[in-house]
């Protein structure tokens, strides 16, 4: 205990983050199947909120030191403006820290203003932290060069730099945050992509699939946006509409009215859904499946449908039989790989089950939320013609774009993996939490499948 008291606040925050992370791993391994579902849901969310806030506290201490503490010895430290500045910074950090807790209490048909403000501050927090690090690194490099050249940096110059660094970081953060909010507020771009498909039946040439992903209904995305997405999809007149995961961030009962516009989708050959990692974070997948089915959106729970030019028929994965029509494609969907990590009962990526009855002599299209799942699927079944994924958001905001690019085998857009194999990763139709898009653009993808010899 004495050693803990001697630790700095930053070290204590780091220790807290490690402790919460270990508890998350332990609870996933030992409590996932023994706890009642509602209790498990609350435990998982509470652990996530505490873990994120422990990490945020480390950054908050750095932001406070850079923008407030380092300026306390400046001539303006006793001014009313500086006292007001301290209140503004404190409120900004408090809002950023409260963002993840809005998942508990502030989810409804439409976003609450507080949730939008809190998540906007979280986005600005990430941008500011990045630029403070960059400017600090530049300052350290300058001081090193000055020392090596024998130049002495005066106290007045040091004071100016202490003021200049946070001023620049705040200015850049403000500009980029406003740009990101305005970008995210725009309707998603409609991107048309033509994909050559080997063995595509002649009767299904120019088949149109509209791809949605990562809508994230929850604290900052509600019914109004969902209605807009549905209208945009219907204008495209798709043959098939697919939603490749992360539709929601809360329970089905809470978001029932927000997701209701999906029932107005018009797709000649049906609308289909596969889970993303966030569906499992809600711990309410069964209720989401039932709700989507009532809206005429068919979940593909490690199963497939055989689709011809005129009809769709449930295929393998435990139900139904094959289509009698020879001119068909196999549209399969797998559970998100996060279900295995969370030990979510009855769920987990099962490619063999999903592709049961899908002949290599026919076109195979797979829905798999994460690009990592797409990579694993292609390693096991290289005969898959097209995989549709999401998850990355194309990074959503700078500088997270860099991390998303490095952590995923496929980042965004169309990839030709082999002569007859393609992967398309959607950058997302909305956004997760933070109502910003910086260095990325939300998208509704119109995929035109073209017959290839």
Curated annotation (Swiss-Prot):
A single Gene Ontology CC term: membrane
Annotated a divalent metal cation 2 binding sites: 246, 277, 391
Xref: Pfam families: Metallophos (PF00149)
Stretches that traverse the bilayer: 7-27, 43-63, 87-107, 114-134, 162-182
Cofactor note: Binds 2 divalent metal cations.
GO-annotated molecular function: hydrolase activity; metal ion binding
Cofactors, names only: a divalent metal cation
Lineage: superkingdom: Eukaryota
InterPro entries per record: Calcineurin-like_PHP_ApaH (IPR004843), Metallo-depent_PP-like (IPR029052), Metallophosphoesterase_sf (IPR051158)
Residues involved in a divalent metal cation 1 binding: 214, 216, 246, 393
Protein location: Membrane
Keyword terms: Hydrolase, Membrane, Metal-binding, Transmembrane, Transmembrane helix
SUPFAM superfamilies per record: Metallo-dependent phosphatases
Enzyme's top EC category: hydrolase
UniProt similarity note: Belongs to the metallophosphoesterase superfamily. LOC643853 family.
Annotated PANTHER family: TRANSMEMBRANE PROTEIN WITH METALLOPHOSPHOESTERASE DOMAIN (PTHR31302:SF0), TRANSMEMBRANE PROTEIN WITH METALLOPHOSPHOESTERASE DOMAIN-RELATED (PTHR31302)
Stated name of the protein: Transmembrane protein with metallophosphoesterase domain
Species per Swiss-Prot/TrEMBL record: Homo sapiens (Human)
């Amino acid at each position: 205990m004495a050693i803990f008291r001697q630790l700095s606040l930053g070290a204590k925050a780091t220790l807290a983050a490690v402790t919460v992370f270990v508890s998350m791993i332990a609870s996933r391994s030992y409590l996932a199947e023994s706890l009642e579902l509602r209790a498990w849901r609350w435990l998982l969310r509470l652990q996530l909120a505490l873990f994120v806030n422990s990490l945020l506290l480390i950054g908050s201490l750095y932001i406070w030191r850079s923008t407030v503490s380092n300026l306390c010895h400046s001539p303006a430290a006793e001014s009313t403006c500086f006292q007001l500045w301290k209140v503004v910074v404190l409120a900004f950090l408090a809002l950023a820290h409260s963002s993840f807790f809005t998942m508990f209490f502030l989810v409804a048909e439409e976003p609450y203003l507080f949730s939008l403000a809190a998540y906007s501050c979280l986005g600005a927090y990430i941008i500011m932290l990045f630029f403070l690090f960059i400017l600090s690194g530049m300052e350290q490099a300058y001081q090193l060069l000055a020392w090596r050249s024998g130049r002495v940096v005066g106290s007045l110059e040091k004071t100016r730099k202490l003021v200049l660094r946070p001023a620049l970081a705040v200015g850049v953060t403000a500009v980029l945050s406003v740009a990101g909010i305005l970008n995210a507020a725009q309707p998603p771009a409609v991107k048309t992509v033509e994909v050559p498909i080997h063995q595509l039946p002649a009767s299904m040439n120019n088949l149109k699939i509209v791809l949605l992903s990562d809508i994230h209904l929850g604290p900052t995305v509600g019914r109004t946006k969902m209605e807009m997405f549905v209208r945009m999809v219907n204008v495209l007149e798709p043959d098939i509409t697919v939603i490749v995961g992360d539709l929601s961030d809360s329970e089905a009962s809470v978001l029932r009215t927000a997701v209701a516009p999906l029932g107005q989708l018009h797709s000649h050959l049906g609308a289909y859904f596969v889970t993303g990692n966030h569906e499992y974070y809600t711990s309410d997948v069964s209720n989401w499946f039932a709700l989507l089915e009532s809206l005429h959106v068919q979940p593909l729970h490690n199963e497939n449908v055989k689709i011809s030019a005129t009809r769709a028929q449930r295929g393998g994965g435990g139900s139904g039989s094959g289509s009698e029509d020879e001119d068909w494609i196999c549209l399969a969907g797998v559970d998100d790989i996060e279900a295995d990590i969370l030990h979510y009962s009855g769920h987990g990526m099962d490619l063999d089950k999903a592709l049961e009855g899908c002949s290599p002599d026919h076109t195979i299209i797979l829905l798999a939320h994460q690009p990592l799942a797409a990579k694993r699927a292609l390693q096991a079944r290289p005969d898959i013609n097209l995989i549709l994924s999401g998850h990355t958001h194309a990074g959503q905001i700078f500088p997270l774009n860099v991390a998303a690019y490095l952590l995923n085998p496929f980042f965004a857009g169309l990839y030709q993996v082999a002569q007859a194999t393609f992967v398309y990763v959607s950058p997302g139709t909305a956004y997760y939490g933070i109502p910003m898009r910086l260095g990325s653009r939300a998208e509704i993808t119109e995929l035109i499948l073209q017959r290839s010899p």
